[in-house]
Design a protein with these regions (language model features):
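Substrate-binding groove of N-acetylhexosamine-processing glycoside hydrolases
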Residues: 1-200
Length: 200
């Protein structure tokens, strides 16, 4: 069995999970059952060195480590594909370098689970190839198209309704989505209903 590790780190660091200078209590590490592995979850950071530091802290527990990454489906009705790439490529580089064998990728359903899982199929394939040590998106795109018949570049555009140009972090883009794109999509929806003769 594995436990998500933030509970131990937050106890030692007054609520902070991602601090690199946390002093983990020896008693906590010692009393963790030997059959429990730790899941280090992180979907936010874009620096490989950050993942290296966090994995190093987890190794102090002397337990098996899982890395839990994420393909961003939980910030609205469209995926955050660019931010998934920006976080998961350095994460998987660190995972390979630090010889972490167990990896899981989350697709959380926050905000009503509005984002269809299919829209991150390309991101999941890219993450899988990062785990293999392949980081060239040209190669990954060609493989993905051969395997699925779908163009990686086309699926990347799914993130556009809630993204700003050259903006990888998902926070502020949600404001744009709610103020601009959602009313536009509603207008398109109502226009299609009227043209099909369906009642409003």
């Amino acid at each position: 069995a594995h436990m998500w590790s933030d509970m131990f780190f937050r106890l030692a660091a007054e609520g902070d999970y991602y601090g690199h200078d946390v002093q983990l209590p020896a008693e906590v590490m010692k009393n963790l059952p030997s059959n429990i592995s730790l899941a280090y979850w992180d979907y936010y950071h874009t620096e490989e060195s950050h993942y290296d530091a966090m994995i190093s802290l987890h190794k102090k527990f002397n337990r098996d480590i899982w890395f839990a990454g994420g393909a961003w489906t939980w910030s609205g009705f469209a995926p955050q594909t660019r931010f998934t790439y920006a976080t998961m490529q350095p994460a998987l580089k660190s995972v390979r370098k630090n010889k972490i064998e167990n990896v899981l990728i989350t697709l959380w359903g926050d905000n009503g689970g509005e984002c269809p899982p299919f829209t991150v199929l390309n991101a999941l394939y890219a993450i899988r190839r990062y785990a293999d040590g392949e980081y060239d998106h040209g190669v990954i795109a060609a493989e993905f198209q051969k395997l699925s018949g779908l163009r990686l570049k086309t699926l990347i555009y799914w993130h556009c309704p809630i993204s700003l140009p050259h903006h990888t972090r998902p926070t502020r883009s949600l404001i744009l989505a709610r103020r601009c794109y959602i009313p536009i999509l509603f207008y398109v929806y109502m226009t299609e209903r009227r043209s099909s003769g369906k009642p409003r």
